[in-house]
Regions:
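A short glycine-rich beta-alpha junction/loop motif
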Residues: 3-7, 101-107, 142-167
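Non-catalytic DNA-recognition/assembly elements of restriction-modification systems
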Residues: 8-34, 160
Length: 168
């Protein structure tokens, strides 16, 4: 009998065989700018609360007055905050769920799933709530002396990280 290719740890609802792939094979980077002022909602990424309005999280807006050069993120897309914290020693990856759209600093790495029929968005939400991805990010991360907890991770390296994903 053929051995099934599944990880020891399973997320509820994902029962299929799994395969190893590069993140960039299942997602694409989002670099869309807020050039047409499609949104004025400045967001931040909190390890605890996800993508959240800066004014709600910090009790003030910390974004620049001119946010046309910020990334525009849409509901269902993901963002990676490279800042380390007690709750997120390797940063935090969160999906935009609370709002229809918002803007983020270009320091963040944004991405969306290439084929929602192939990869369930809930899988990535669950995956990035675990520490399973930390091994991969450790391989590419370097913390600069002047970065004060901001990991030096190039977008190209981020999308080269390996992950186990359910097969089609």
């Amino acid at each position: 009998m053929a051995e099934r290719r599944v990880p020891r740890i399973r997320f509820k609802g994902f029962e299929e065989d799994w395969e190893q792939c590069k993140l960039g094979e299942i997602v694409e980077r989002v670099t869309r700018k807020n050039e047409n002022m499609e949104s004025t909602l400045a967001l931040t990424i909190s390890a605890q609360y996800g993508l959240i309005n800066q004014e709600e999280f910090f009790d003030k807006r910390i974004a620049s007055k001119n946010i046309e050069g910020y990334f525009l993120i849409r509901k269902g897309e993901f963002a990676y905050n490279k800042s380390t914290s007690m709750d997120a020693p390797w940063g935090a990856v969160k999906r935009l769920d609370r709002y229809g759209r918002g803007v983020l600093s270009t320091l963040y790495i944004l991405f969306r799933i290439l084929n929602e029929q192939q990869v369930d968005s809930e899988y990535l939400v669950s995956y990035y709530c675990t520490d399973l991805w930390h091994t991969e990010v450790q391989k590419i991360a370097a913390e600069g002396a002047r970065n004060h907890g901001l990991l030096n991770i190039a977008p190209n390296d981020f999308f080269e990280m390996n992950l186990a994903a359910p097969k089609e």
